[in-house]
Amino acid sequence: MLSASAEEGTYGSLSYDVINAGEIEITGCNMDVASVEIPAEIAGKRVTSIGDNAFRDCTSLTEITIPDSVTSIGDGTFYGCTGLTEITIPDGATSVGFQTFSGCTSLKKITIPDSVTSIENNAFYGCASLTEIVIPDGVTKIYSGAFYKCTSLTEITIPDSVTNIRVGAFCGCTSLKKIVIPDGITSIEGSVFYGCTSLTEITIPDSVTSIWSSAFRGCSSLTEITIPDRVTSIGDSAFYSCTSLTEITIPDSVTNIEGFVFTDTPWLTAKQEENPLVILNGTLIDGTTCTGSVTIPDGVTSIAGGAFDSCTGLTAIAIPKSVTSIGDSAFYRCTSLTEITIPDSVTSMGDYVFDGCTGLTKVTMPDSITSISDYAFRSCTGLTEVTIPDSVTSIGDYAFRDSTGLTKIVIPDSVTSIGDSAFDNCDNLIIYGHTGSFAETYAKEHGIQFAAYTFGDLDNSGKVDSTDIFYTMYYVANVAVGNPGGLTQEQIAAADVDGSDKVDSTDVFYMMYYVALHGVGKDVSWEEVLAK
């Protein structure tokens, strides 16, 4: 950063500042200049740096000579220099900065010295004429979008010194045919090779443990790939639309497979023909060709995102208790699915999980989940009633938006957060909850009708009596031996009189005490009973 007292000057077509006790930084040039030679010294002072955006949008500039005295080239220095065809970065420069050559569409050749250790974000973004580049051995990091849409780049050598290739580094390099990822890389980050449509061969080293979202998406010429044994996770859409991919070697080490990983590949099509339920290492990755009633086999531990995306022929599904997670958009727009029971083994459900399931009329959620995700039941127009389990603490953004048939939702006291527009366009909705609860506050603030349900009144008779005590005792006894309790979620919420988020013998005691006091004419409140 320049000090307030920095001395300014000009040298031919160049402008500069005197910085750092007598060093020169080039700060700009005449916009119509075609050729520039930066001197090593100006007025006896060494030229050591070129400032941020110094030659930005100098579209007439076709050649430039930079002296070895320059050790720092700023961000965006040659951004948009569309006439520049080649450049040599001087020895001593340590990085190719943010957007340094971004938009240099005529740049065909660049020499990067061994002194450079990093290539920053979008450094060569859109350098559409660049055909090859050699990255020197000293480089350790290639940052996000560094070579984004270098559409003429056919080959690139990445040295073993590189340990980090960031998101989208080679995204859209449509002429790139072959690449070897060095041994030091531990993760292939998101969209790194997205849209490399000419890529036919890639070597993934044994050091890699994860492949991120969309890493190879749209690599339409890739025919085979071997995933090394240390990889444990593959992100969503990692190989999406690899339309020539027929052979994939996937080790047992891969235990986390996200959504749409192999969508639109010949490999997946072949698997679907063998069995419409495509299961890989315990993850159900695809069931989009299923019709009618489907039973997921025991042993499946997760349902990947988009597994049944737009599976309009699916009418019913049985999920085993081995399943612990259901991914984003797993049942997105399954318009013929009418009801679903989620087992209590499931602890998480992704965003959009039942979004657009217009035929869904009944959903049973377990006490094992703690949140209703964003867009989870958006546009489920057939749903009329929903009971949120006591375990849930938050309801996400747009969770029930446009579920226009929804007239009743029971929200327990455990819920303390409801996201933006969660119930938008649910015009006939009544929220049921306890007086003084967050649900009541939310309903009033958002102009939604609220109905309070009474503690202890399980049969909605308007009073708490021996019938309610019997129902509660029956529930507690059955649950204690592992049987279904026989109560709805709404009844369970009413039976949990002590607010412990569970129904047990303590609730039975308080109900008996409450009924006994009222039986002898004492009109006590629940607050008074619980205070005893």
Question: Where would I find each of the regions flagged by the language model?
Answer:
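Extracellular adhesion/carbohydrate-binding repeat motifs centered on closely spaced tryptophans
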Residues: 18, 237, 267, 271-290, ...
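Structural signature of tandem-repeat unit edges
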Residues: 13-22, 31-49, 59-72, 82-95, ...
